[in-house]
Amino acid sequence: MEWERFRNVSVENYAKLQVNILKEILGEDSIIIHDFSGGYFDKSFDFSKVAQHIDVVAYNNYPVWGGQKEPIPPHEIACGLDFMRGAKRQNFWITEAIMGALGHDVIGYL
């Protein structure tokens, strides 16, 4: 449990440090984005804590990924999208998306 807490605080502090450096170099009016991946409930850091330090949340939406027998159920995709919107309580960007298992052994769900 202590390791989880340490990791959470460390990731947040590192993100804050990076944002501060970028703002100093690029200017306070620059927009800082972080591209969050899925699997947020399995991660050992709080996405919303990191989101406090950036301007825009971005998300990689992969409803189908290689080796799956079937796509991620729509309600799980919706949960991920809701979670990203809630991280800053504002709209977010989809910066990567895949609608089929491109380059993997199972294709053609959608």
Regions found by a protein language model. Give the residues of each.
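Aromatic- and acidic-residue-enriched carbohydrate-binding clefts of CAZyme catalytic domains
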Residues: 1-5
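Glycoside hydrolase catalytic-domain groove-lining segments
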Residues: 9-106
